[in-house]
Amino acid sequence: MALPLPSGLTPSEVAFLCEMELVTVVPRQRLESIELLTGTTPALRPPHRSNLPLWLAILLKKQRRANIVPPPWLHPDSLRDIVHQETMVDRKGWAPPPPPPARADSRGNARNPFMDDETVLSPPFLPSCTSDAPAGALPYHWFEVAEMLLAHASDDISSSSEVRSLLRDLQEVRAAKMRSSTAQLEGGVDGVMSLRGVGAMELAESRGFVIGVVEGVRKLGASTETTRREEEEEGGGQESDEQSDEDMGL
């Protein structure tokens, strides 16, 4: 008998989707543009930087044809600030995600370049893992990107051992918050759980646990509602019998 498929994305599927994130590379060799399903990649001309999908950047790194520039949020100073934010400043919430990119007009006023578009872009189509990404804010695929860069381009990351330690601390803190935040759902159907700033891998790993808690709360609420209705029906039946006796003069 085959087991049912798990609901949602598995961690391996999330890691596969993460490979579409754009990262910044410094090419060592010239490379012409490549036609991909997602569009045409920029032509690589050393030493000019270019943004490429993560999977292609890792492939060029393995071939020693490019170096990967880690995003600013993967710097040790930035990770220390995020850990401080998670453990000291906001012990119940998560670090805020990076803001949408802003572009200055002719008058110097910043605006969202995608505001006029009908399509709302989200990761991996936002530059949240390139060298222009803001520091101090974790993107949606922060954990997967960090693991892949440390596995395949650790020599391009400054203080890689310290980065690994900070990422481990950050993962443990956020995992504990994810487990404790489900206590907000114990109040019934009105329980609300904020997921702003939670990453893709964290959602995939906690999906089964959170869904189990929500389903248990739903069953408890349904049982309570059924009991209340039965009591109301029994009370209504007794009142009808008493009214009938009064009408008959008994």
From Swiss-Prot:
Compartment(s): Nucleus
Question: Gene Ontology cellular component?
Answer: GINS complex
GO terms in the biological process aspect are: chromosome segregation; DNA replication; double-strand break repair via break-induced replication
Reading the lineage from the top rank, the first entry is: Eukaryota
Methyltransferase in keyword set: no
Keyword set, alphabetical order:
Chromosome partition, DNA replication, Nucleus
Where do the segments described as Disordered lie? 220-250
Per the record, where are the segments of Acidic residues compositional bias?
231-250
- UniProt xrefs under InterPro entries: GINS_A, GINS_bundle-like_dom_sf, GINS_Psf2, PSF2_N
Keyword check for Transmembrane helix:
no
Subunit comment for this entry?
Component of the GINS complex which is a heterotetramer of SLD5, PSF1, PSF2 and PSF3.
Describe its function: The GINS complex plays an essential role in the initiation of DNA replication. Has a role in chromosome segregation.
| Recorded family membership | Belongs to the GINS2/PSF2 family.
Instruction: Identify this protein by name.
Output: DNA replication complex GINS protein PSF2
Q: Which organism is it from?
A: Gibberella zeae (strain ATCC MYA-4620 / CBS 123657 / FGSC 9075 / NRRL 31084 / PH-1)
Organism phylogeny: Eukaryota, Fungi, Dikarya, Ascomycota, Pezizomycotina
